[in-house]
């Protein structure tokens, strides 16, 4: 499986730092997340919530949420990579260099 959006997202995080994205936060699994890797099967793709991807491993994105340190793993969630889990690849925002 190769997702060009995911490749760009990983490359830009590596080069420039954290990237804002949108995710589907409506699932019970997302709402009650406390550890592990949130898999695609446990969340939808109807994005409704902004979060910040701060890093990644080959298996998951490291995502900072705005719901405070009491939620998730001290305010973070690990979301499965490679399958657009929770719609994470849908609305990634990162800058590109433009020549003027």
Q: Across the structure, where does each feature detected by a protein language model lie?
A:
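Predominantly the structural core of cysteine protease catalytic domains
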Residues: 1-62, 69-100
